[in-house]
């Protein structure tokens, strides 16, 4: 889809070890500019999740992230937004699937990598259509991409860093992915953060999904049950930027002390 020379050019902006990752990374960057350059999309959706953390707050990216997670800002019909997303992402071709339900809409584009070995790539866009709220307020964040294949800029609608990390803390409890632990660890060790705000946001988002939010003791028990699980610990290492040193045990001790024991 993207000529080899543009992928080679983009390598100067990334440290990913294989060409397919470099190509997919460039696709993500263009998709973000295309989406948030559109007035309807920018009014309707906010950028959240791991890709938001690493693309707009924690540059250079410490780990690879391949999905775009969005949240519908207000409760309104989503179909006009889906139609506009399709229009803005025409450059990805026609191999597109859409799954809709009351809480989420998932769009997946599929394409083949340009540089051999040819592999199947995808861009998944997931829209949360249930959490029409924020805790610390939305913000506009300047974002730009420069490449001979595509150059452009926009203002991405997203959240305060502490709010993104509050939702990440919720994800750490809810699923078995070591990348959630890594993201929290990397943010705390590389940014001056308001821990109380992170915990406050976590509680607000957890209160939204469960009647009885887990206590600190319950969260710690949850983590003890998976911190040595190969599924959890093995999730992150293939995603790390070359040269990034990381140990799950060290990360857990830091997150346990700074966050979990303060819930």
Task: Show which residues each predicted segment covers.
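Structured mid-to-C-terminal alpha-helical surface segments
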Residues: 1-45, 56-63, 68, 72-263
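Glycine-rich beta-strand-to-loop/alpha-helix junction loops that act as flexible
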Residues: 47-52
